[in-house]
Amino acid sequence: MKFILLLLAVTLTVSVFSQKTESYYDFYWKPCSKENASYFSIVQKTDSGWLRTDYYYRSGQLQMDALYEDEACKVQTGHCYYYHANGRPSATGRRVNGKNEGICLSYYSNGMTSDSANFQNGLVVDKRFRWHTNGFPYDSTSRLNDSLYVRVSWFDDGSPSSAGYMVFDKPEGKWQYFHHNGQRAALEIYNDGKLVGAEYFDESGKLIQDTSGVNRESSFKGGEEAWRKYLQKNLHWPQRLEFKTAAAVTIGVDFVVDENGKVINAEVWMPFHEEFDKIALKVIKNSPPWLPAISHNRKVKAFRRQPVTFTWGEE
């Protein structure tokens, strides 16, 4: 009998470990070889579901720890933990059938809280608060009933930015937007999330007639092609670092284009190797001026996430 029980225990142990899979992914989370990996993933079957742990491959730092209902890891269940490359928490919360449940929190890489809300079946219960990277409030959303919310937002210096109502996460009715000096910049009317009427004002409060430029994305002067050429011209493969075969290395850099078009707050969010990281960060920081973003008739800061790719062994 002891022999049978021992054999059974060994069989179960082998069975458990046989359901553990390891995978490598590139910068874009596509399966790849070990040499070109940015992430490393382990998926293991447990009594509660499929436990997935993702790591930043080069550093070994944990990127995610979460439980899934399915082997394909599409539907999260239970507590989930995410981390920045520097080891600080990125997000934490609980999922039920893939939807947020209970208090969920998000954090910037500097450790400041970026988002806090209480969820029920994926919907915000009562209030939601978000913050800028410097700790100033970004916006506040309050639930008035099952479908109606009121949202107020601020610039990162604490001055009012906007206010209005949301119905099922779509703007509804009258929305007001403000310049940094407190003057109203825009009065917009929405119906089921669609803009149906608007008036725009300059910083002195005067109504403006030409509304063609009240919204635009931040952009590099000369467009995407000029930006690509700038990166190609200034990037170089680090000295004394060689690959045996042709390879591509991608670094992830976050930065902000401020109201004057200057690149600020650049940081590496997806590192590869210290020498590559330094070069990528320097190129982004030394960028020529951009055209700043305009949102609801105000120049605003714009967040950008830029993949920076180095190639080896190619013409």
Where are the model-predicted features located?
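Extracellular and select intracellular beta-sandwich modules with Ser/Thr-enriched
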Residues: 302-304
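Bacterial Sec-dependent N-terminal signal peptides
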Residues: 1-24, 231
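Glycine/tyrosine- and acidic-biased, solvent-exposed loop/turn segments at the edges of beta-strands
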Residues: 19-263, 267-299, 311-315
